[in-house]
Amino acid sequence: MAKKVEKLVKLQIPAGKATPAPPVGPALGQAGINIMGFTKEFNARTADQAGMIIPVVISVYEDKSFTFITKTPPAAVLLKKAAGVEKGSGTPNKTKVATVTRAQVQEIAETKMPDLNAASLEAAMRMIEGTARSMGFTVTD
């Protein structure tokens, strides 16, 4: 018989840098997960993606065992890295802070494709372009 999922915990943690300190420790402690076991396994799985923020969904079962799924980094993080800026614009409709090319948008869309609710690469690119515009980025050909 399959184990019953008791709780789902969603976190965004820098790749390879999960520690028992807040915010990771308290979130996992409340769910009753072995914090050291999770941090070691997460860091091992994400060591190759250093510098990125990785969303993770942790399924906690009734017997306090757990499994987790790592997702692709958020589109905003990938866009900031591609544009080489620290943060988006405070007023995206007035102040444009950076420019990204369609090729960069396509690359990001291909990376994000497994996690996006898009039927085609074109649809995924439109989603990423929308995120870029809302951050105050200009998309150029």
Swiss-Prot record:
A single cellular component GO annotation: cytosolic large ribosomal subunit
UniProtKB keywords: Methylation, Ribonucleoprotein, Ribosomal protein, RNA-binding, rRNA-binding
Subunit structure: Part of the ribosomal stalk of the 50S ribosomal subunit. Interacts with L10 and the large rRNA to form the base of the stalk. L10 forms an elongated spine to which L12 dimers bind in a sequential fashion forming a multimeric L10(L12)X complex.
PANTHER family listed in its UniProt record: 60S RIBOSOMAL PROTEIN L12, LARGE RIBOSOMAL SUBUNIT PROTEIN UL11M
Family: Belongs to the universal ribosomal protein uL11 family.
UniProt PTM comment: One or more lysine residues are methylated.
SMART domains in alphabetical order: RL11 (SM00649)
Statement: the UniProt record of this protein carries the keyword Amino-acid biosynthesis: no
Native source species: Streptococcus suis (strain 98HAH33)
InterPro entries in the cross-refs: Ribosomal_uL11 (IPR000911), Ribosomal_uL11_bac-typ (IPR006519), Ribosomal_uL11_C (IPR020783), Ribosomal_uL11_C_sf (IPR036769), Ribosomal_uL11_CS (IPR020785), Ribosomal_uL11_N (IPR020784), Ribosomal_uL11_N_sf (IPR036796)
Gene3D superfamilies reported for this sequence: Ribosomal protein L11, C-terminal domain, Ribosomal protein L11/L12, N-terminal domain
Cystines in this chain: none
GO process annotations (BP): translation
Molecular function via GO: large ribosomal subunit rRNA binding; structural constituent of ribosome
HAMAP family (alphabetical): Ribosomal_uL11
Gene field: rplK
Function: Forms part of the ribosomal stalk which helps the ribosome interact with GTP-bound translation factors.
Name of the protein described by the UniProt record: Large ribosomal subunit protein uL11
Keyword RNA-binding annotated: yes
